[in-house]
Amino acid sequence: MKIPFIAIATVAICASCGPAAQNSTETRTDSATTSAVTQDQMIAPAKEIAPLPQPDTTAILFDTVTIEHPRGDTFDLYVPSGFQVAIAAHGMNRIRFMDRSADGRLFITDMLNLADNTKGKVIILEDPDSSGVFQKQSLYLDKLRNPNSLKFHKDKSGKDWLYLAMTDKLVRYPFNPGDTRPAGDAEVLDTYPDYGLSYRYGGWHLTRTIEFDDEGRLYISVGSSCNVCVEKEEVRASILVMDEDGKNRSIYAKGVRNAVGLAWTHGSLFATNMAADHLGKDQPDDAMFRVEKDRHYGWPYCYHWNGKVYADPKLDTASTKVSPHEVPGAFSYFGAHTAPLGLAWFGEHEAEDPSLKNYFLVAQHGSYSPAIGRGYSIQRVREGNPPEDFVKGFLDAKGNIHGRPCGIFSIGKDDFYFTDDKFGTLYHVYRRH
């Protein structure tokens, strides 16, 4: 399948400063009635943190690429000058996160739809043609409970596994190159609250996300059961850490309402986080954190907005367990309701182009209402600064939604995939040579 494009035209447009910058001059509403804690008043890191390499901060000039989607939609996307974006696969459903096996095939999760269901899949994509379009899609696993995240990992004995995070459990399957179905039964490593979307203490956030550190320890995020509440289950709104076999599980960090994106680089865990929805369309900020062990990141007692931390008036009582002074500052603030999901680091091994090298990329899924108009893009992120658009155009000027970015996966220098879980499409972004 070939995806036609019109000729590329360079457009001298600077990268968006992002919602966080747009909101920086807004006045506080009545919902923020307590004094704020500024970034320099927030608690210092508990340990020495390795600095990240500094990126080039030159503003991005964009090229326009017209996408003719096979579902009948034609729209423009905007990518940095010198880059291209194209459809690599389509015809799937709610595709989320991905990883590549040692034999070069791409494995991708598909949650089917927004409902709590057991019809999820893991799909294998392979045999890309000269245009980078995958010619073969095959089923690896099915009848899964909301599969969101998967990772390939070689354990300390040298055995290969495919790890898969679902609503109710974390499992792993033995894996051999060339496998078209699992090489053995699933080994259950951990289980999680599982009472459905309608149950206050057990519903809401159905996704789980996994990441490994340099020592092979496994991290998994478990979202809250509610918008704002004091949880009954300790694992809610947390990031857990455990050995690669599921043993020695402990809570790594608390107070992260829904950390869907995780990435390990330079000795630290980084996470995106979706904030609560009860304070209006302009607050609180969704954010990204450099996550430290045993820290509490505020939810439900505190929230971030415009670089400051506030006590949530809904829970600001004498029994409040966390004050704004105890909450670490964010790595970057995204603005309200951008819905940050997938997260990936692009260092010297993943990028050469200065517009991408030494930046994180974040998939901004987009606000629950297109009228709010935030997100719907891939943004580059550096510490202490608002995000900047890297791929944009999924929400057009008329309010039409052409996609909702979700997962990001690097496949080489200046070369990556990202998923659109609204229309089941995999996009390929690469630097033209």
Language-model regions: role of each:
Residues 17-20:
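Bacterial signal peptide processing site
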Residues 98, 150, 155, 210, ...:
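Hydrophobic core register within WD40 beta-propeller blades
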Residues 72-90, 127-143, 175-200, 232-261, ...:
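Blade-edge beta-strand/turn elements of extracellular beta-propeller
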Residues 105-109, 158-164, 217-221, 268-272, ...:
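Conserved beta-propeller blade signature
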Residues 111-113, 165-169, 175, 223-225, ...:
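Short loop/turn segments immediately following the C-termini of beta-strands
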Residues 37-80, 207, 225-227, 242-245, ...:
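Beta-propeller domain segments
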